[in-house]
Amino acid sequence: MTTLKFRNNDKISAKVFILGSTEDINKIGLDQNEADYVKKSYDDDKKKTVVINRYTECFHIFFIDTTEDENKFMEQCRKKGASICKWLNTNKYEEVLIQNIGGKRCVKMGTAEGMMLANYEFKKYKTDAKANSLKTIYFLEGTACEDCVEKLNITVEATLMARDLVNEPVNQLNAEKLAEFISEKVRSVGGEAEIFNKKKIEALKMGGLLAVNAGSIDEPTFTILEWKPENPVNEKPIVLVGKGIVFDTGGYNLKTSNFMNDMKDDMSGAATVACTVYAVAKAKLPLHVIALVPATDNRIDGNARVCGDIITMYDGTTVEVLNTDAEGRLILADALAYAKKYSPMMVFDFATLTGAASRAIGPVATVAMEHNAEEIYKQLEAVGERVYERLVKFPLYEEYGEMIKSDLADIQNIGGAYGGASTAGKFLEHFTDYPWVHFDIAGTAFLEKAEAYKPAGGVGIHVRLLMRFFRDMVKKD
């Protein structure tokens, strides 16, 4: 991981200068020819990054208009950081110094964040892989608060950890290994963890998790991760629930190969919530936060559930299973019902749940829904705009509840041909009685190709959003 640090001098060969206007050009040590070149480049294209490549050092110079919408110019800084990171690695630089000349300090943080996120790579299974050269990003001492730098390092570390988990294939990370890894990580920073094995899950009668696991050669797990500091600002805990389908074949509603190839990503929700608790604990935030991670793969054998089976969930609800590929909601339902025992302040669930959500808005935003949490959702939405992990609210109309009524059981696990994201949300809502927000990350958790600071593969989506949301909660107290 690339780390962000302070240094007491600018004697370094690679520098990034962020300028607020052309008046700042003469403040960065350029000779007249270089300054004229930068000015002409700016006049030709105000969004261009100008590279001054000397024999012993290089400068990357770009301009940010901080009079624009802050969310947009911060995203511009992240993208600039990502592109500069690529150049630095291509040219084998190991360190870089970022300075903002005029304007707001936050542009420097955004640029560093973009570099750190863009420098991610997952090459552990390549026998001849060479790591990226960039190792350290520097600010000059006194030009940013130490706390802000520490926050960014922790948040990026957790985001990259989530990416790693999503990118691991199931033969390396089954449900048991996932549970062990996230438990060890949370304990390493002072949190607590408990893993329920199959016997315990059977005793709790978590029928959804057991039904999905019926065709697997590996046992399911249900992991509880907790960070409970002394005197937390929240009297009731915040509970995060993450879908942990470590691989999804679709069951007897078998996926075709083009839809199955990336189904190691079906535990992205689990990665998000587990790595967020890790970050909260490492940052020692005064918040009581719990993550619930039901985990299994969804495979086929002679014991696997088939269409038409009726199962009984943790809370006693009976469910007619009409599609074995709508399995994520079954394991989430048990976890959401289990969350009631904590009398939570709020509950958020994260799941690569429906193709309908992905098809509706693609990879540029996450579909979200809420029940009895309108103000909380508005805060999350605003934070999503700030970190550019945007949310689009879908409805939970009562008519969607009619679509999942069953003639043979209390409810069924799919609706009709339309409104698939909302009928899935309505199914989950049945198991809640607290302020709840549902995040369907099917379109945002895993990318086919890299986009600026987001890599191809696992994105680690919404760790950044949650950490900003939680820090805002602490500030308001």
Model-derived regions, located:
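Short amphipathic alpha-helical segment within the helicase RecA-like ATPase core
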Residues: 1-244
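A generic structural signal for tightly packed, nonpolar segments enriched in small/aliphatic residues
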Residues: 1-3, 56, 70, 179-477
